[in-house]
Structures are given as C-alpha cells and as structure tokens.
Amino acid sequence: MKEGVAIYPGTFDPFTRGHEDLVRRASLLFNKVVVAVAESHGKAPIFTLAERVEIARDVLAPFPNVEVTGFDGLLMDFLRQRDARLILRGLRAVSDFEYEFQMAGMNRKLFPDVETVFLTPAEEYMFISATMVREIARLGGDVSKFVQPAVNERLLQKVSLKR
C-alpha cells in the first residue's frame, strides 16, 4: 500500500543513476514523490537551478507519480507550502548517516510534524556521489556509468566550456 507524499530534496548537480534509482524505488512506496531541487547558495554548482530541474525532469519522465521542481530557501518552508510531512533521503555510507541524522533532528526541531525516511541505494550505486561525478568529469574522466547518456552529454559540454 502506497503512502502520501515524499519530498526528496537535493542539489542534484548532476542528477546521477543513484538519484534515479532512489526515486524509482520511492515511486513504488509513495503516492507522489516530489524531487525538490535546491538553489544551493553555499555551493558552486556546475548547472544552474533551471538546468538541474530540466535534467531531473528528463531523467524522471517515465515515472508518472514523480514531480520535479526547484526551490530556494528553507526546506521546512517548502514542506509547509506543499503541506508535506515526509522527507526522503538516501544513505550511502556511515558518513552519510551522521550528517543526515543531525539534519533530521534539526528539521524536526523546526517542524515537529516532519519525518525523515532513509533509503539505502542499490548495491551498484552505493559509491556514486554527485560531487565525485563532477570532479571526475572536470578532470576529463569517463562518468557515463554514473549518469544517463543525456546527462553525460550535458556534463561534458559544461566541463569543456570551463577548461
């Protein structure tokens, strides 16, 4: 039986096969999954917010109960606007758990009704991080195993412009 709405926030710079796998599996668990692409003022993303939203929409088009939207500001404000109470996060390793555990606690302090649900990635995606994918691409490495072909093409265009 599927449950309500899950908000899956992130920078998604770039949107990886690991992100896609998590959304695919979440779409089987929840009535609706909202992929909330963050503006991310504290980071220097390769792709603009609009580009990251477009890329995620393209990758996730096969999933009818998935919506992709951008947002700026506090995640808790976004949840309130959406009348949502569930945050979906992926956990790849123990190092992810410590950070995500702290964030879940802080989010609950800001919005006591919120719950955070963690999914672990499929084994083949456990090591993929968008940060590593960006760095490998910047250094001229092949990231085609970690992202969809259209994402790889756009990533190659971006990094070649920055060289």
Curated annotation (Swiss-Prot):
Binding site for ATP: T11, F12, H19, G90, L91, R92, E100, Y125, M126, F127, I128, S129, A130, T131
Gene Ontology biological process: coenzyme A biosynthetic process
Molecular-function GO terms, alphabetical: ATP binding; pantetheine-phosphate adenylyltransferase activity
The keyword Flavoprotein belongs to this UniProt entry's keyword annotation: no
Location in the cell: Cytoplasm
EC number: 2.7.7.3
Catalytic activity reported: (R)-4'-phosphopantetheine + ATP + H(+) = 3'-dephospho-CoA + diphosphate
Binding site for substrate: T11, K43, L75, R89
Highest taxon of source: Bacteria
InterPro entries: Cyt_trans-like, PPAT, Rossmann-like_a/b/a_fold
Pfam families (alphabetical): CTP_transf_like
Cofactor: Mg(2+)
Function: Reversibly transfers an adenylyl group from ATP to 4'-phosphopantetheine, yielding dephospho-CoA (dPCoA) and pyrophosphate.
Family that this chain belongs to: Belongs to the bacterial CoaD family.
Protein name: Phosphopantetheine adenylyltransferase
Gene from which this protein is expressed: coaD
